[in-house]
Amino acid sequence: MESVAYILIFTLCIGTIFFAIAFREPPRFEKPKDK
């Protein structure tokens, strides 16, 4: 049953990082593309 808790925590971490990047400047690890 612990696997479910780990999946939930992992999802929350990914979501937090995703929103943090989304509301910040675009990622810089790739060359800037026209958009």
Curated annotation (Swiss-Prot):
Chief place of localization: membrane
Subcellular location(s) per record: Cellular thylakoid membrane
Keywords, ordered alphabetically: Membrane, Photosynthesis, Photosystem II, Thylakoid, Transmembrane, Transmembrane helix
Membrane-spanning ranges: 3-23
Gene Ontology annotations of biological process type: photosynthesis
One cellular component (GO) term of this entry: photosystem II reaction center
InterPro entries: PSII_PsbT (IPR001743), PSII_PsbT_sf (IPR037268)
Membrane protein topology class: Single-pass membrane protein
Entry-linked NCBIfam families: PRK11875.1
PANTHER family: PHOTOSYSTEM II REACTION CENTER PROTEIN T, PTHR36411
Subunit and partners: PSII is composed of 1 copy each of membrane proteins PsbA, PsbB, PsbC, PsbD, PsbE, PsbF, PsbH, PsbI, PsbJ, PsbK, PsbL, PsbM, PsbT, PsbX, PsbY, PsbZ, Psb30/Ycf12, peripheral proteins PsbO, CyanoQ (PsbQ), PsbU, PsbV and a large number of cofactors. It forms dimeric complexes.
Role: Found at the monomer-monomer interface of the photosystem II (PS II) dimer, plays a role in assembly and dimerization of PSII. PSII is a light-driven water plastoquinone oxidoreductase, using light energy to abstract electrons from H(2)O, generating a proton gradient subsequently used for ATP formation.
Family named by the database record: Belongs to the PsbT family.
Protein name: Photosystem II reaction center protein T
Organism per entry: Nostoc punctiforme (strain ATCC 29133 / PCC 73102)
